[in-house]
Amino acid sequence: MIERIAVDPNVHFGKPFIAGTRITVQSVLELLDEGLSFDEIIKDYYPDLAIPDIQACIQYAIALVAAEEIHLTAVPA
């Protein structure tokens, strides 16, 4: 399903987007963060999307975070 996500340096400055569209993964994730349902995103914002496109955005974000090495630094009190 993650194959639905594309990255092209000539589209949105290389930010990941849903293949066949110009809709960024970030845009979809922000709508989810606002509490919108998959159906609301499709009906009210992106009628060309399908539920698997939104699921692919979530899977892409999970894969990105899982692959990243995180280093925490202590913050002085």
Predicted features along the sequence, with ranges:
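Basic, low-complexity segments
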Residues: 1-13, 76
